[in-house]
Amino acid sequence: MNQAILQLSEIEKAFPGVKALDKASLNVYPGRVMALMGENGAGKSTLMKVLTGIYSRDAGEIVYQGQSAQFKGPRDSQQAGISIIHQELNLIRELTIAENIFLGREITSAFGRIDWPQMYAEADKLLARLKVKHSSKTLLGQLSLGEQQMVEIAKALSFESKVIIMDEPTDALTDTETEALFSVIRELREQGCGIVYISHRLKEIFEICDDITVLRDGKFIGQCEVVQTDEDGLIEMMVGRKLEEQYPRIDVVHGQTCLEVIGLTGSGVHDVSFTLKRGEILGISGLMGAGRTELMKVIYGALPSERGVINLDNRTINPISPQDGLANGIAYISEDRKGDGLVLGLSVKENMSLCALDKLSKGVQIQHQDEVVAVDDFIQLFNIKTPSREQIIGNLSGGNQQKVAIAKGLMTKPKVLILDEPTRGVDVGAKKEIYQLINKFKAEGMSIILVSSEMPEVLGMSDRILVMHEGRITGEFEAKHADQEKLMACAVGKKVSEEAA
């Protein structure tokens, strides 16, 4: 193996009440892809923020291209040849793709004016490399979340960096977009670029990475080549124990029909009908753009319905806003927890109780003691790792933020809980905890809708599965009669009946 182009040795970083990094180390080699693995809260993102100068380090050393380095901030590290593609996109919806890619370093003519034709041409070349079909003159806001992620990647490529850090780069990508990204990674690897690949998707690690570094509780656990381990060994390194069963589904006797949807049509949704019983988990599968999230938002009241009937406990409802949906007993946990679900500048307590203040109030007075008791109960029940209920939620790991988002929905004591991509960006240990919580609510008779892009998750946790394509339901299966091939056939628009299956 070549000499490392980047070495982080025994890095330490502490925040009030938390030691985020405790002698964490990472080596990045030219022409190789290094997976950085660990549970949420293991210190992966903190280590990258120390590297790029967002956080100062308390101890340890950074060596880049054989020289000791300490970057003053992201611009400094970027100019030195280290780019980071964050899990949360740093883009402006109101600007064009090209303007986003070259923001702050626009291509100019000899007279100091922006050379628009040249800038669009360079941006179009980058988009072509990533197989993005849009013109760089397109406004970013017109793109899907997955396409916006590809623009973020194009922006990093424009720096011709020697080290590129990708933090959960495929979280919002379709299979086609993911394969395009992998082609670019292979191309960059051939050019001698060192890549740090942060992901919880074990399949991707074994497909695209050469080496693996594992962190746990801020500590360096080990480094190995991908060919030297397997999924079980990697999980054990990450969580410090064996996970016996990935999807711990339980069988519960279902009760009466709780939710009935008849001929529902709305934004991106066409003539959808289904039922949901008490104590049942209904999985919703489909490819990106199939209309799954839109369907949930119409049911919840976040998007308008044009026609159709929604019956909840034999009573027709017509939610016209999220507040209306909550008041009727429907809680929706968004796929975009940082955009729709949480207020990052508020505390754990404030976020968790935000939607339940009416239930925690007498008249206009919030019963703060009741609020504290309820929040503390959820922190304990969900095993949320936080120094206190007053901790700013933006400082928590992704897995713990997701647990708070789910608790926030449950604080309203809903009849129907809609979970949209509940384990996106969450590590294997936190996933298992979330699955166990879902089972607990199921056993208590709650009706749950589980929307997920991960087919094994839908198959593993659901009792019954609906598949969507272009806003319509193209398949319905009992989970025990379904498999990935049947779900994928329906997801691309092929009608598959359970009898034929």
UniProtKB/Swiss-Prot annotation:
It is a peripheral membrane protein. Disulfide bonds: none annotated. It is found in: Cell inner membrane. One of its GO terms (molecular function) is ABC-type D-ribose transporter activity. One of its GO terms (cellular component) is plasma membrane. Its EC number is 7.5.2.7. SMART domains: AAA (SM00382). NCBIfam families: PRK10762.1. The complex is composed of an ATP-binding protein (RbsA), two transmembrane proteins (RbsC) and a solute-binding protein (RbsB). This is Ribose import ATP-binding protein RbsA. It comes from Vibrio vulnificus (strain CMCP6). The lineage of its organism: Bacteria, Pseudomonadati, Pseudomonadota, Gammaproteobacteria, Vibrionales. The gene is rbsA.
